[in-house]
Amino acid sequence: MKLANLFQDAMSAIRANNIPESALRLLLADTFGMGLAELNTRLNMDLKDDILTRWNLRLERLLRGEPPQYISGQACFYGLQFKVCPGVLIPRPETEGLVELVLERLHEHQLVLDCCCGSGAIALAIKHMRSDATVHASDLSSEAVTLAKQNAADLMLDISIYECDLFPTTTPGYDLIVCNPPYISDTEYQRLDPSVRDHEPALALRSGNDGLDHMRRLVYQAPSHLTPGGLLCLEHGETQRESIVGMASSQGWKLEYAGADLAGKARYLIFSKPNSHHTTPAVSNQDRSRGYNG
């Protein structure tokens, strides 16, 4: 059997199951050990029975809606290969834009914290590009912390990873805190594509009734973990900007940047640390239990 025939059969199957072609191509490339750009040039390749058996098992999982990154066990982010697994969020392409914004603002030998680090994608991408930076990462999920440590070892990048709720308690002030927190509301969560809702961890996606529980904690608590003039860099939901800017302004944060992702959706905010202290609202135990993402 040739790859072209397999591809045609698989295309028919995914169309019948409303699976995007991009997911199929990702899984094909990984299964047959080639880059995405190679697929169209290797369609005449003959396939052996053992690889066909492996492919058929993988295709069954894809047709059940499982993300191709979980099937292959890896995802590409900022040109690096990361291990991924169910229980830890798959890094998204739009988050690469957040990394770019951090790199543009990072001075030499600064101390950076990536809250809600998940697989470690943001923290490790920053360290890969800026070896002079001291990078810390944190996550409430022990599974995420274990995976992030594996990725750091595989990529031979030296970062410190903490299992904690947002902020490590034993570290000095950070020059920059970056976070892609959970920001899906309860209502939005029910409308998510089943490939996300049924397979990726709810703990990494949901953030209370309005999707802003984590944002509130970051806005209220981050100042005590930043150096004077320190930056808070956030990824957020496309309808949340006004609410986040409003709560940040009420706490004295200075808005330094507001930007969109490559699809033109409002996605990024950067604030500088308030000059004065504001009252921090109490955080419930329920809120404290949600500090996890990828």
Which sequence ranges carry the predicted segments?
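Non-catalytic accessory regions of SAM-dependent methyltransferases
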Residues: 1-40, 45-47
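C-terminal lobe and adjacent flexible extensions of AdoMet/dcAdoMet transferase-like proteins
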Residues: 269-281, 293-294
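Conserved SAM/SAH cofactor-binding pocket of Class I
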Residues: 94-191
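Residue-level signal for inorganic ion chemistry
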Residues: 27, 65, 95, 122, ...
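Conserved AdoMet
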Residues: 29-101
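Short, intrinsically disordered C-terminal tails of secreted or membrane-associated proteins
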Residues: 289-290
